[in-house]
Regions:
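N-terminal Rossmann-like NAD(P)+-binding domain of SDR-like oxidoreductases, especially those catalyzing
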Residues: 1-181, 302, 310, 314-321, ...
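Conserved alpha-helical elements of sugar-nucleotide-dependent glycosyltransferases
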Residues: 18, 195, 253
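A short, amphipathic alpha-helix embedded in the catalytic core of nucleotide-handling enzymes
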Residues: 26, 109, 165, 195, ...
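C-terminal substrate-binding subdomain of Rossmann-fold SDR/epimerase-dehydratase oxidoreductases
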Residues: 29, 201-331
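Heptad-repeat alpha-helical coiled-coil signaling segments
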Residues: 108, 186-187, 217-219
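Hydrophobic alpha-helix immediately C-terminal to the catalytic Tyr-X-X-X-Lys motif of short-chain
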Residues: 157, 161, 165, 195, ...
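Short beta-strand->alpha-helix junction loop in the catalytic core
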Residues: 183-185, 279
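Conserved catalytic loops of nucleotide-sugar-dependent glycosyltransferases that act on lipid-linked
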Residues: 188-195
């Protein structure tokens, strides 16, 4: 943890789900000062309220696409955590914006981190790089040929850029392939997170959660605080030029998720099934998490029901506010 003690840090996307939870974890780990770069398109000021009260956190409202700003903020930093991205659905709707944010933005971060000789860069990748995997549990060496999303392609290229910067400049980096992150502060407009929110609304209203189809598609859920902790461990470790799955290593079907949520919310309703909709191409996710355990000392600690309980507690007072943002989703 000596690398963290008193460190000056930049967190991009630091007002978002994982970013803000990471800021909290970094303060706890004893870093000296944190600059957060966030354009607040997905990030929320509330997510940083606790951290900003520490007096050690400064929010800079801006974009990773702003090369000069990124360089200014990276100068003099010991550590950089790159979490900024746009969501997978928006990448499909606006691929040029996705290119500018996900690819050019990440290039700016890599260029600045290498140029200003930061000790280490920890950056977010995604299980999306695998597309519909062929091997389960899925290890990091699984190929990327099955991915057909722009988001996944951008994350693959980000990984490739990071490796090449390591080869060209000696940049120390670790990248983390997040699987299905859920929990307090989560982006409520994501593909599966939106489903969770609708279920919570229905259950609270005394109506059964609705699943389109059999609900047997699976995900590998990892709690927000666990994903944040993985970043802290990656920064503290001596590992470099490494890419790791960050997941629970447990497969959960949509049906099991709905049933767990019913239990957590104290409801005895049964899940209701509707007609199957067009299927998302990825019907199964299960990560091999042994590499992260071996090299980073990371293992997910928060069990699904415990995590869902925390999610419900966070969501309840924000219910109306969250529902109101659904129709006018920020483009």
């Amino acid at each position: 943890v000596s690398r963290l003690e008193g460190a000056t840090v930049l967190v991009t996307g630091g007002a978002g789900t994982i970013g803000s939870t990471l800021v909290d974890a970094l303060l706890e780990a004893g870093v000296g000062r944190i600059d957060v770069l966030d354009n607040l398109v997905r990030g929320r000021l509330d997510n940083l309220a606790g951290a900003q009260a520490s007096g050690r956190v400064e929010l800079v409202r801006g974009d990773v696409g702003d090369r000069d700003l990124v360089h200014d903020l990276t100068k003099g930093k010991d550590l950089v955590f790159h979490q900024a991205a746009i969501r997978i659905t928006q990448c499909a709707e606006e691929p040029r914006l996705a290119l500018e944010v996900m690819v050019d933005g990440t290039f700016n971060i890599l260029e600045a981190a290498a140029g200003h000789k930061v000790d280490k860069l920890v950056a977010a990748s995604s299980a999306s790089v695998y597309g519909m995997a062929e091997e389960f549990p899925t290890g990091e060496r699984h190929h990327h040929a099955n991915n057909d999303t722009f988001y996944g392609a951008a994350k693959s290229f980000n990984e490739g850029m990071a490796r090449s910067f390591h080869a060209m400049t000696g940049l120390d980096y670790v990248m983390l392939r997040y699987f299905n992150v859920y929990g307090p502060r989560m982006d409520v407009h994501g593909l599966y997170t939106e489903v969770l929110v609708r279920w919570m609304e229905r259950i609270l209203d005394g109506r059964p959660p609705l699943i389109f189809g059999d609900g047997l598609q699976t995900m590998d859920f990892v709690y927000t605080a666990d994903a944040a902790r993985a970043n802290v461990l990656a920064a503290a470790s001596d590992t470099t030029d490494g890419i790791y799955n960050i997941a629970s290593g447990t497969e959960t079907s949509l049906l099991e998720m709905a049933e767990a949520l019913l239990r957590v919310m104290g409801s005895d309703l049964a899940v209701e099934h509707g007609p199957a909709r067009q299927v998302n191409g990825v019907v199964r996710r299960l990560a091999d998490t042994s590499a992260a355990a071996r090299d980073l000392g990371f293992k997910a600690e928060v069990e699904l029901e415990e995590g869902l309980r925390e999610l419900v507690t966070w969501w309840k007072p924000l219910r109306d506010e969250i529902a109101a943002t659904r129709k006018v989703d920020a483009k």
